[in-house]
């Protein structure tokens, strides 16, 4: 039980850690000369403030393949694919051969109906200018 802290003590310990973490100031960014010197020396791996390069790391494969991304089992088994394929084919065939209903007629009428374009009489030459219109 000596390793277990009471609730107030644990809270105080967390607060101390937070204060210690917040009091750390980030290091100043390297100046132009220092940045150029780092690039020239090639010490990028030693500087913890620079981002890691994946292409030069050991994690980067020498050659990328699809198998590495998708894994070896990228194909689904036929018993998973076939029922879905047959269900979708049956739905398309049913939609093609079914009888037309009143809902289909209404939808066709709404989609094929031509809406007359609003005629703007003020655009015709010689038409009187509307009150307050800018010319």
From Swiss-Prot:
InterPro entries: UQCC4, UQCC4_vert. The keyword Transport applies. Forms a complex, named COMB/coordinator of mitochondrial CYTB biogenesis, composed of UQCC1, UQCC2, UQCC4, UQCC5 and UQCC6; stabilizes nascent cytochrome b/MT-CYB and promotes its membrane insertion. Forms a complex, named COMA, composed of UQCC1, UQCC2 and UQCC4; activates MT-CYB translation. Forms a complex, named COMC, composed of UQCC1, UQCC2; UQCC3 and UQCC4; mediates MT-CYB hemylation and association with the first nuclear-encoded complex III subunit UQCRQ. Complexes COMA and COMB are bound to the mitochondrion inner membrane by UQCC4. It comes from the Eukaryota. Required for the assembly and stability of the mitochondrial ubiquinol-cytochrome c reductase complex (complex III or cytochrome b-c1 complex), a multisubunit transmembrane complex that is part of the mitochondrial electron transport chain (ETC) which drives oxidative phosphorylation. One of its GO terms (cellular component) is mitochondrial inner membrane. Keywords: Electron transport, Membrane, Mitochondrion, Mitochondrion inner membrane, Respiratory chain, Signal, Transmembrane, Transmembrane helix, Transport. Residues 98-135 are mitochondrial intermembrane. The chain crosses the membrane at residues 77-97. It is a single-pass type I membrane protein. One of its GO terms (biological process) is mitochondrial respiratory chain complex III assembly. The keyword Transport applies. This is Ubiquinol-cytochrome c reductase complex assembly factor 4. Residues 18-76 are mitochondrial matrix. Residues 1-17 form the signal peptide. Residues 21-58, 115-135 are annotated as: Disordered. It is found in: Mitochondrion inner membrane. Expressed in cerebrum and skeletal muscle. Pfam families: CCSMST1 (PF15013). Belongs to the UQCC4 family. It comes from Bos taurus (Bovine).
């Amino acid at each position: 039980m000596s390793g277990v802290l009471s609730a107030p003590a644990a809270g105080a310990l967390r607060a101390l850690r937070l204060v210690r973490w917040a009091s750390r100031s980030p290091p100043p960014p390297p100046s132009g000369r220092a940045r150029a010197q780092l690039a020239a020396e090639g010490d990028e791996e030693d500087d913890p403030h620079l981002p890691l390069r994946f292409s030069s790391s050991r994690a980067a494969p020498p050659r990328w393949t699809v198998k590495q991304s998708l894994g070896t089992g990228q194909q689904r088994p036929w018993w998973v694919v076939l029922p879905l394929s047959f269900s979708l084919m049956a739905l398309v065939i049913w939609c093609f051969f079914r009888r037309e209903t009143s809902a289909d007629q209404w939808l066709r009428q709404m989609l094929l109906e031509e809406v007359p374009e609003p005629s703007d009489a003020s655009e015709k030459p010689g038409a009187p200018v509307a009150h307050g219109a800018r010319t």
